[in-house]
From Swiss-Prot:
Stated name of the protein: Cryptide Pep-21
Modification type Methionine amide: residues: 7
Tissue specificity statement from the Swiss-Prot or TrEMBL entry: Expressed by the venom gland.
GO cellular component terms, semicolon-separated: extracellular region
Organism this protein belongs to: Tityus obscurus (Amazonian scorpion)
Keywords: Amidation, Secreted
Subcellular location: Secreted
Amino acid sequence: TVPDLEM
C-alpha cells in the first residue's frame, strides 16, 4: 500500500 504523507 502507499504510505500516507502526514506532515
